[in-house]
């Protein structure tokens, strides 16, 4: 269990509670979670973070009415900056988007501006929003993470409790390598409901070579770990930086969707550019 799982801030969330669905616009449905909840225990300070990055959200269930009452549908792309005070709690985001369903907007840009304003207010930070018509995305290929997949290892695992022990002495030799490693075995659980969160992760680094077996065991140890997606990515970045001490490091996870939303956080201390094409499980 995370050290802050019972924090009073989390007690006020709608997540894990029975809620009514509203179909007329209501910005108050959005709820933020302070990033400091998991950053403080990791020793990460807002004014001296070892990374940059964004939380990339894809909105698959977004609909509203135009000025004449005709329903509109779109796919939304949201990027929430790592410097924001809060992350956006996903169930509240879903409830908020549902409140657009029977609300009239004059045009698409009004919808985009409304989303950007409300999300920025909730996150207390920079947020960008783009809306796409369905025909703009039709035929878009399924993407994949570039890199070497480390999943096909003939190893025995019988412990699924989170630990950083596997990263102790996880680098070898003095030779500096630059490589990208990929795993599709990342599974953590919602901090509140403990529902499973399934993801693929890409780790790009420059430094002493990381032992792939130890890295895979470390990633598998998240299987019983309860944290939000964004928090897991920052924990992984921080642990790799601490134990493996790479010169450059980027960590990018793309999670499967729930409630019409997928969350894809990345953190980097280099010039990393994330691919935003959905993966096969998304």
UniProtKB/Swiss-Prot annotation:
Protein's cellular compartments: Cytoplasm
Coiled coil spans: none
GO cellular component: cytoplasm
GO biological-process terms attached to the record: queuosine biosynthetic process; tRNA modification
Reaction(s) this enzyme catalyzes, per UniProt: 7-aminomethyl-7-carbaguanine + 2 NADP(+) = 7-cyano-7-deazaguanine + 2 NADPH + 3 H(+)
Alphabetized InterPro entries for the sequence: GTP-CH-I_C/QueF, NADPH_dep_7-cyano-7-deazaG_red, QueF, QueF_N, QueF_type2
Residues annotated for substrate binding in this entry: 88-90, 229-230
Active site: 190, 197
UniProt keyword annotations, A-Z: Cytoplasm, NADP, Oxidoreductase, Queuosine biosynthesis
EC number: 1.7.1.13
Protein name per its UniProtKB record: NADPH-dependent 7-cyano-7-deazaguanine reductase
Organism encoding this protein: Escherichia coli O17:K52:H18 (strain UMN026 / ExPEC)
């Amino acid at each position: 269990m995370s050290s802050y799982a019972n924090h009073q801030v989390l007690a006020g969330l709608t997540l894990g509670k029975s809620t009514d669905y509203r179909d007329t616009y209501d910005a108050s449905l959005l709820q933020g979670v302070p990033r400091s909840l998991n950053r403080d225990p990791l020793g990460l300070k807002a004014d001296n973070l070892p990374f940059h990055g964004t939380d990339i959200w894809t909105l698959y269930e977004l609909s509203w009415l135009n000025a004449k009452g005709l329903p509109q549908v779109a796919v939304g792309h949201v990027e929430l900056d790592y410097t924001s005070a809060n992350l956006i709690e996903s169930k509240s985001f879903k409830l908020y988007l549902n409140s657009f369903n029977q609300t009239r907007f004059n045009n698409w840009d009004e919808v985009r501006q409304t989303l950007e304003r409300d999300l920025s207010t909730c996150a207390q930070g920079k947020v960008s929003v783009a809306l796409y018509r369905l025909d703009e995305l039709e035929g878009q290929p399924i993407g994949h993470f570039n890199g070497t997949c480390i999943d096909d290892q003939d190893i025995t695992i019988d412990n699924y409790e989170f630990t950083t022990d596997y990263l102790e002495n996880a680098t070898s030799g003095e030779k500096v390598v630059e490589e990208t490693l990929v795993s599709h075995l990342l599974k953590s659980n919602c901090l509140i409901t403990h529902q499973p969160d399934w993801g693929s992760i890409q780790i790009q680094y420059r430094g002493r070579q990381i032992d792939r077996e130890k890295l895979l065991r470390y990633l598998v140890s998240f299987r019983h770990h309860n944290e939000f997606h964004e928090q897991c990515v920052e924990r992984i970045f921080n642990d790799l930086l601490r134990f493996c001490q790479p010169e450059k490091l980027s960590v990018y996870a793309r999670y499967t969707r729930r409630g019409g939303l997928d969350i894809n956080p990345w953190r980097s201390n280099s010039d990393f550019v994330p691919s935003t094409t959905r993966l096969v499980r998304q």
